Amino acid sequence: MSKIVKILICFLVAVVIVIMAIFCYFFVGRAVIAEDITWGVDFSQMQTEVLGLNWKETYLAIINDLGVKNIKIHTQWDWIEGKKDDYYFNDIDWQIQQAKNKGVKIIYVVGIKSGRWPECHAPAWMTSLSDQQQKDKVLEYIKEVVLRYKDNGAIINWQVENEPLFKFGECPAWYYDDGEFLEKEVQLVKSLDSSRPIIISDSGEQSNWFEAAKIADVVGITMYREVWAHITDGWGFYIKSFLSPVTYWRKALLVKKFFGKDVMCIELQAEPWASRTFYDVPLAEQAKTMNPDIFRQNIEYAKKTGLDKFYFWGVEWWYWMKTTQNSPEIWNEAKKLFQQN
């Protein structure tokens, strides 16, 4: 056997060993299950209205009937500043006041990309501005929000943008190209309010979370188990995540070790992810990616990740199913969980 062949074999063996070690680290074993888990929900006024619901009724039901004590509020810039320099905060004021009245803790999402399609919610008037002018207006908007609410005790965290490092959604061309803008946003928030930890969210499945950890005080991640894999406009397929619960735990350990940051789940799938917007497909199609059994499975899966904070994505859909489809099963299942929390 020649020397070159021996070297090649040794190299291949080393590669296999490294691959096996990586696989074992991220997929083999069990996480230490947290003794005290916090459960919350993500809430979007826009989403409730898209579903044809009364958003105030829905919000109050979340607090008073479900008994939720932790809410992440998704706000849309185009709703707040539909007219340039004319801010409308009445609806957000109401949401935060209701939370404060009931001792509910709020995570406030601020920025241009704040969740729910089309992800970036830029006002129509912004399109006539240059890229730099658009960035300046985003910072002005953030400043208005933080100064308005920084003295409100209901808010426990600012989340700057929603998955800003994950290229998904309809956003201005500069949004993902300017690698420093997110840091400018975070620096601005910290300069206005240094008392609250800042969350930067990232894809739980398609990222190592390191870039978010460099900027954030707390890393927020997503956790989606049953989704539609969109290949083209006319073709795709349903897929179930192959990730082990311990994958999230081990990634969180790396973030803690190298960056000293905690990781929390700010989006735990609890609504359908269908081939089209879920309210445009039949209930039978919706049930392929979310139903009471999948909901319970996702809760048990989440517990096994070792994380101790989870916010459900889909509470508006639960209420829609309960009040318009006579299907309160997930709402009632969640209610039992929140009563224990």
Predicted regions and their residues:
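Substrate-binding cleft of secreted/luminal carbohydrate-active enzymes
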Residues: 156, 262-341
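Glycoside hydrolase catalytic-domain groove-lining segments
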Residues: 176-179, 184, 191-278, 329-334
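Boundary/entry segment of secreted carbohydrate-active catalytic domains
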Residues: 22-69, 74
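N-terminal Sec-pathway targeting helices
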Residues: 1-20
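Conserved, mostly hydrophobic/aromatic
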Residues: 63, 71, 99, 145, ...
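Active-site cleft segment of glycoside hydrolase catalytic domains centered on the general acid/base Glu
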Residues: 81-84, 119-195, 202, 207-209, ...
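Aromatic-lined substrate-binding rim segments of carbohydrate-active enzymes
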Residues: 56-127, 172-199, 214
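Hydrophobic faces of well-ordered beta-strands that scaffold small-molecule active sites
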Residues: 39-43, 71-73, 106-110, 156-160, ...
